[in-house]
């Protein structure tokens, strides 16, 4: 019988094992969480996303962004996983990680100052009027890969579909819905 266990045989000849001492806990390095620091950093990262949203709202020309607040801003880790988001329009966030992952996968040579835009529903977009802008962030000038990403997704009134508003009810192909941006390099610094 293993240490910490006791074995006994019942009247019906069943073998019963009982733990008599608690199991030794092994913890991996860095897995202990300080709840206070977790909350501090959670609020810090959420505040960054909220400030991104304020900048977007204050500089936007679109009524959908400026007044309807139909946008979302978030931070993502180096693999495209969501770190924090502001409480703007939650529906945008469900697939935004996939947009980030598309940019990461298709741009191994991205550089500081690059900004990408996409709205492709096949690569993490929701629908064509929701345009996502992705910016890789480098913490050091000599970093080869981004440390994390920031992204914003905003709804635009018209993206050039066959009907005003870019959401034709009788479209049979995505081409009828408007312009599709898929991993387009918008800015190279």
Which residue stretches match the model-derived regions?
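Conserved SET/PR-domain catalytic core that frames the SAM/AdoMet-binding pocket
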Residues: 2-7, 79
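Regulatory sensory and allosteric helical modules in signal-transduction proteins
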Residues: 81-85, 97, 101-120
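Long, charge-dense accessory insertions within large macromolecular proteins
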Residues: 20-24, 30-92, 97-100
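Terminal amphipathic helices with adjacent charged low-complexity linkers/tails
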Residues: 7-28
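Mobile "lid/hinge" segments at catalytic clefts and subdomain interfaces of large enzymes
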Residues: 145-189
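A short, polar/charged loop-to-alpha-helix boundary motif
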Residues: 90-103, 157-166
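A short, hydrophobic, proline-anchored segment that marks a local hinge/packing element in signaling
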Residues: 132-141, 151
């Amino acid at each position: 019988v293993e240490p910490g266990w006791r074995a006994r045989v019942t009247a019906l000849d069943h073998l019963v094992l009982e733990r008599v001492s608690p199991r030794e806990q092994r913890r991996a390095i860095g897995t202990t969480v300080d709840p206070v620091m977790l909350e501090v950093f959670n609020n810090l990262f959420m505040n960054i996303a909220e400030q991104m949203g304020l900048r977007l709202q204050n500089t936007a020309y679109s009524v959908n962004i400026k007044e309807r607040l139909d946008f979302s801003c978030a931070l993502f880790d180096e693999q495209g996983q969501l770190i924090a988001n502001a409480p703007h329009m939650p529906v945008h966030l469900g697939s935004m990680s996939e947009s980030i992952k598309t940019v990461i996968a298709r741009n191994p040579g991205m550089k500081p100052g690059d900004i990408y835009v996409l709205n492709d529903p096949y690569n993490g977009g929701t629908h064509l009027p929701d345009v996502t802008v992705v910016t890789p962030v480098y913490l050091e000038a000599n970093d080869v890969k981004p440390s994390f990403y920031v992204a914003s997704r905003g709804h635009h009134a018209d993206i050039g579909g066959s009907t005003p508003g870019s959401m034709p009810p009788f479209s049979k192909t995505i081409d009828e819905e408007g312009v599709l941006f898929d991993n387009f390099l918008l800015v190279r610094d």
